[in-house]
Amino acid sequence: MKTNIVPIANAIFFCGDRVEGSGNPVIERISNLQKLSEIVVSKFGSSINAWVIEASVFNGPFAVYKDFIPSMNQYGEPRSYNPIGFPASTSTVSLLSNCLEEAKKVILRTQVGSRSGCTFACSFSQPKTFILGFSKGGTVLNQIVTELGFSDIGSNVNSPNVGSENTYIVPKTKEDLLNSISDIHYVDVGLNTAGAYLTNHDVFERISKRLMQGAPQLRFLLHGTPRQWNDKRRDWIRNEKDKMLRLLESEVPKSLGKLKVFSRYYFNNMPPSMQMHFEIIESLDVS
């Protein structure tokens, strides 16, 4: 009997805009979707499932996450983050569920004609969820964090829904997803307009309140390079990052020690470049 082991966590990586024909072999290699999934697994361990998500729509090279963010311009830049309808968490759950079903079909087809079977193991603990947003992919994180702040803790925290096997491979509902999130990684995020980082104090106050009411520990990790954090032409990126960091840190004392906040700066002695913007993915410290 060949068993597909249930992961200890699902790591979901949201990509940014496309960079094609750069002529830079480092950028071309790291931006490959298969390579990205391998990097994610190398960071979190082989007992996780890695999911690399691109926008469903592109306007030229610009990623447009229209199914995840309710209000944006034609270039995929958000006008606001609003929890109504929970579009980002709902879309994420739908994507993971569809991908899992396709994976099952592929695995079952490979077993046809062989003596070994294939089963999807059941588990009594729901896997954690790690979410990573790279470059413009950080806008999806902002939307998910907003939805997290406005979501109910619910009775399913640390209480698995017995009898539903998919629950233990990927979250089946937006509540499952939001309540399973333990790590939120902003990876060199940035935009050509405001909105790269979330600066809504109300959202962070609500998240702190959730933690006090029994939600599991939550870590925010902000990873950056000079490419984004030292860009004088887009100084709002650093200003937004600094404000988000201050807002999060102001909630730490209220969270009963369950909110953890980290800021990590990479390649700080190097001049800004597009290459370092991608190399940070390989250099991520997710500990």
Regions found by a protein language model. Name each.
Residues 1-10, 44-49, 88, 110, ...:
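A domain-start/cap signature at the N-terminus of enzymes
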Residues 1-69:
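Short, surface-exposed "cap/lid" segments of acyl-processing enzymes
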Residues 37-51, 180, 210-220, 245-261:
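Structural alpha-beta junctions
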Residues 52-115, 156-161:
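Short acidic, low-complexity segments enriched in Ser/Thr/Gly/Pro
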Residues 221-287:
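C-terminal catalytic histidine-bearing segment of alpha/beta-hydrolase fold enzymes
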Residues 16-20, 56-58, 136-137, 190-192, ...:
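Conserved beta-strand elements of beta-rich interaction domains across eukaryotes
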Residues 101-217, 227-230:
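Serine-dependent carboxylesterase/thioesterase catalytic core
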Residues 26-38, 85-103, 145-171, 197-209, ...:
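Well-ordered, non-membrane alpha-helical segments in soluble/globular domains
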